[in-house]
Regions:
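Extended, highly charged
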Residues: 2-193
Length: 193
């Protein structure tokens, strides 16, 4: 896949694909329940599980975080993410898989993901909104975390979206029992020692 530093017109619209823009769009379509009142992290799982709509929590936990859940929890919302009707969702997925777009690289410090960078003692995973999601969870989790790995054999980048389990302030883990590219990369590395 080609890498470009600029978009097709020489400019990158940094807001076009922001999660906040999509949630605002869904909210205008009546697909989001907005919870303004303070919400404890321990209450999230029940509130999310009981609701079929997306939920936008405006004030969660001691740090007063905003959290959104179930954004992709229906075919309708997935279709809206791709600007197609639900009837055209599968064909749109197939079309996009067959026609990958070039990667647009945004250099530091312009990348929105680089607005807050914590290092050393300031890098503390427990400051993120991990919470117990299911009755039998052995630890708090964060949903829809993006993991990024590079296959050492091929150099191919692998990106996955998984639940991460909080181990301590510096470590999180994930489940590698389900078939995935990450599991294959891990298994291959273990076999090589």
């Amino acid at each position: 896949m080609a890498v470009s530093s600029l978009g097709p017109e020489g400019m990158v619209d940094l807001n076009k694909f922001r999660l906040r823009r999509f949630v605002e769009k869904l909210n205008k379509l009546g697909e989001v329940d907005v919870i303004e009142k303070p919400t404890d992290l321990s209450d999230l799982a029940t509130l999310i599980e009981e609701n079929l709509r997306a939920i936008w929590f405006k004030d969660v936990g001691p740090d007063n975080l905003e959290i959104v859940a179930s954004v992709n929890g229906s075919r309708y919302r997935l279709a809206k993410a791709m600007d197609v009707s639900p009837d055209n969702l599968v064909s749109e997925y197939r079309n996009r898989l067959k026609n990958p777009q070039p990667v647009i690289e945004i250099k530091n410090p312009d990348a929105p993901v680089q607005k807050v960078v914590l290092t050393g003692k300031d890098a503390d995973l427990s400051r993120l909104p991990f919470y117990v999601q299911h009755q039998l969870d052995g630890s708090p989790y964060i949903s829809s975390a993006i993991d990024y790995t590079v296959d050492p054999e091929t150099g191919t980048t692998n990106v996955g979206c998984r639940r991460l389990s909080l181990r301590n302030s510096k470590e999180a883990g994930t489940n590698l029992t389900a078939p995935s590219d990450l599991k294959r990369i891990y298994t291959d590395a273990c076999e090589k020692g």
